[in-house]
């Protein structure tokens, strides 16, 4: 009965925790409503034609990571980008979406704002006069906010050396003869900014959300709105209704931050349920990626590019079906268009722009002005199904570039985004991590409590893996020193401070699983839950399993020396080696804590340093505990084996 009662209590706690998290995230009432989005009126004209009007283009660059210690080529290539690339493409504006500097220490573990990195960045902007050529909108990323106690701190070099030089979200309007286009910056950087890795997620509090809601309302009269920020929406903590809801009237959200997951996901694009595109651009740091985007007769197109690769080609009409959305743009203009339209740029003059549809040669596009090339077509010839358009551009130096995409002149056709990319960008990872963390903890506690209050085991069936595992859990749970050690470790991982130290240089604080207290502020937990999951999965639970296995060996009548002489090395040694590797991982986590947060954090870290020191003591106690403590278990096991 006690075991059933304990199970019900734990299950009830788990259900309550899940419901609380869902209510906190989605809310029930009293939250600001997202902007209303009435059905857009039909606007077939002006349709894309032979002229050079109703079009402008811009660039996005992200995660530059200028470093005083690593890869000086980042700065060299950025200077070339700000001179050569900008001069050739001549964008109306450039969005530099965060992590302008690296802000790491020499060994790449710690974090510190280096003024010389910011001076290098500003020096490039001034030397190339890029701010005289285009509107350069640079915003902060999490690296630009590392180790900054407040926005007014002298360490906040963004205020001194950037082009924008102002903290917080803002609204920039690009005015043209054919309408206004809004660009809204989302500043989700953490204030105060802790050292790495505890500011990987961005945070928008209620005040920031209200500011963004006002900016969204300001942009309602613009032809189009693009939101841009450093963090993906999946790595931003925001109260209900959530950042995605507030930006739902925008055609796209342009961001960086994830570095294409180290190259594992070179294309991180998706569409949210409200219709807004989310487009993460690859990093400049290692991959020298950037993006060109354009509005052509209010149809949005873009292409992700590699620096130094020419020609640069963007098909603006017909636009890609994958990135089309009738709720946000006048797709009917495609059906009424008279010309295929292409933007083509290169170091040398463009000599030919060849167009093919479904593999059929359609002709050579004619140069209109600047980078604009057009070719007359009849879209009604392609009124059914989907079609593939290919454009091949050559310049006078012999360079060639071929681009293609699928299009449709029917508005009811759709293509699906990569499911993994959609999962990465559309999932609130801090909520998933929080739920998973709670479930792991509750599962471990449930097992401990059930075996604690169940009766002594009766081994009736053959001693297979499951029976012996159950038996060892009984042993662990019914010997007080081991039961309370594991119980305390699990509860402490959830509730106790992991370490105390300088969260920011000169500012002391405590780190918990649910967040960080520093300098009078509370930073809500996000990456802390992921670190907590790693701690549970790679040390706490394996330690519990290793103790169970060792206690089982004791019940067989062995001590540490005798169990090594069983001549079962292939079964015994892998267990010890695996635990040794996990212990080394725990030791490394102590070193990482020392390198990132200093000596004080290293010394006052119960979950890292203290646990690392106490683990050998606990394991030694397992192997040296008086055999009389195992009396009833040894008798029962030997009786079962003999029978």
Curated annotation (Swiss-Prot):
Keywords: Glycoprotein, Membrane, Transmembrane, Transmembrane helix
Glycosylated residues in this chain: 180, 467, 626
Entry's localization field: Membrane
Residues annotated as signal peptide: none
Gene Ontology MF terms in the entry: hydrolase activity
Main location: membrane
Its membrane topology: Multi-pass membrane protein
Gene Ontology cellular-component annotations: membrane
Record field: transmembrane: 3-23, 431-451, 481-501, 527-547, 572-592, 599-619
PANTHER family, per database record: HELICASE RELATED, TRANSMEMBRANE PROTEIN 62
Name the record gives this protein: Transmembrane protein 62
Organism, scientific name: Homo sapiens
């Amino acid at each position: 009965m006690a075991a059933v009662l304990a199970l019900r209590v734990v299950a009830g706690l788990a259900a309550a925790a899940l419901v609380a998290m869902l209510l906190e995230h989605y809310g029930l009432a009293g939250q600001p409503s997202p902007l209303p989005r009435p059905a857009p009126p039909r606007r077939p004209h002006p349709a894309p034609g032979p002229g050079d009007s109703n079009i402008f283009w811009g660039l996005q660059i992200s995660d530059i990571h200028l470093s005083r210690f690593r890869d000086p080529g980042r700065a060299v290539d950025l200077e070339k980008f700000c001179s050569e690339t900008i001069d050739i493409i001549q964008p109306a504006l450039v969005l530099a979406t965060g992590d302008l500097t690296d802000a790491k220490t020499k060994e790449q573990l710690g974090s510190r704002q280096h003024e010389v990195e910011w001076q290098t960045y500003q020096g490039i902007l001034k030397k190339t006069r890029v701010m005289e050529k285009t509107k350069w909108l640079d915003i902060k990323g999490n690296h630009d906010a590392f180790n900054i106690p407040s926005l007014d701190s002298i360490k906040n070099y963004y205020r001194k050396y950037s082009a924008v030089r102002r903290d917080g979200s803002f609204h920039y309007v690009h005015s043209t003869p054919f309408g206004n286009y809004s660009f809204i910056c989302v500043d989700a950087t953490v204030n105060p900014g802790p050292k790495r890795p505890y500011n990987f997620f961005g945070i928008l509090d209620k005040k920031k959300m209200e500011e963004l809601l006002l900016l969204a309302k300001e942009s309602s009269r613009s032809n189009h709105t693009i939101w841009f920020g450093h963090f993906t929406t999946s790595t931003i903590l925001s109260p209900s209704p959530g950042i995605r809801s507030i930006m739902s009237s925008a055609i796209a959200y342009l961001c960086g931050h994830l570095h294409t997951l180290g190259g594992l996901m070179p294309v991180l694009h998706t569409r949210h349920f409200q219709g807004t595109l989310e487009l993460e651009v690859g990093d400049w740091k290692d991959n020298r990626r950037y993006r060109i985007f354009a509005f052509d007769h209010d149809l949005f197109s873009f292409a992700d590019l590699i620096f130094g690769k020419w020609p640069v080609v963007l098909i603006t009409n017909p636009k890609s079906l994958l990135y089309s959305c009738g709720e946000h743009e006048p797709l009917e203009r495609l059906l009424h268009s008279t010309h295929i339209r292409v933007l083509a740029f290169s170091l040398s003059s463009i000599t030919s722009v060849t167009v093919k549809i479904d593999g059929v040669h359609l002709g050579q596009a004619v140069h209109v002005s600047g980078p604009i090339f057009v070719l007359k077509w009849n879209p009604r010839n392609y009124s059914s199904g989907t079609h593939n358009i290919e454009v091949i551009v050559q310049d006078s130096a012999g360079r060639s570039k071929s681009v293609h995409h699928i299009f449709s002149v029917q508005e009811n056709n759709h293509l699906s985004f990569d499911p993994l990319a959609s999962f990465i960008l559309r999932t609130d990872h801090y909520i998933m991590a929080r739920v998973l963390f709670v479930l792991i903890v509750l599962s471990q506690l449930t097992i401990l409590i059930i075996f604690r209050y169940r009766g002594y085991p009766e081994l009736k069936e053959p001693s297979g893996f499951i029976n012996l595992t159950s038996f060892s859990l009984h042993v662990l749970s019914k010997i007080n020193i081991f039961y309370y050690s594991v119980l305390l470790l699990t509860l402490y991982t959830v509730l106790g401070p992991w370490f105390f130290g300088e969260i920011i240089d000169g500012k002391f604080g405590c780190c918990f699983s649910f967040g960080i207290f520093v300098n009078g502020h509370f930073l809500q937990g996000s990456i802390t839950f992921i670190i907590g999951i790693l701690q549970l999965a790679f040390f706490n639970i394996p330690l519990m399993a290793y103790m169970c296995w060792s206690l089982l060996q004791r019940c067989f009548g062995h001590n540490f020396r005798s169990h090594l002489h069983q001549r079962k090395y292939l079964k015994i040694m892998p267990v010890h080696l695996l635990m040794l590797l996990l212990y080394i991982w725990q030791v490394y986590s102590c070193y990482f804590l020392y390198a990132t947060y200093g000596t004080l954090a290293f010394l006052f870290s119960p979950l890292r340093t203290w646990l690392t020191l106490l683990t050998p003591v606990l394991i030694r106690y397992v192997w040296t505990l008086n055999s009389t403590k195992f009396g009833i278990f040894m008798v029962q096991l030997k009786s079962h084996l003999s029978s």
